[in-house]
Amino acid sequence: MKRVVITGVGALSPLGHDWSTVRARLKEERNVVQYLTAWDGYEGLNTRMGAPVAPFELPAHYNRKATRSMGRVAVMGVRASELALIDAGLLGDPLLSSGRLGISYGSSVGSPAAIGDFGNMISHKTTEGITANTYIKMMSHTAAVDIGVFFGITG
């Protein structure tokens, strides 16, 4: 069996965007769940509670060309991965493109907006709102794909 070594940590979470903040808030048993007024418009939804990710800013190198095929799920995955690579001292390391490093990233689904666009297409029999990037943003493996492309990971 091959070994996997975790050498860096990165996060964009409701508890914070760096490990020291996240760890401190976990130790404090900080509750970040809140009432989400944006969910008030959903008839039959019996909860309004959630823990949204705190606002975050992307560095300048996350330009339109780099992010145009990414939804929010992928952007967050790429940025969290970048923070982990920085923490590990591996950002820009030749290992990334050596074929010896892979990606395992679970996001369950792609971006909800893109899923909604496809749902609209199915329900209303129109491709209005569908672009060349909508499927890429919707696919469940969107974050893993975009992490690989963004950092040139070939393994």
Regions found by a protein language model. Name each.
Residues M1-V109, A113-G155:
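Conserved "HGTGT" condensation-loop signature of ketosynthase/thiolase-family condensing enzymes
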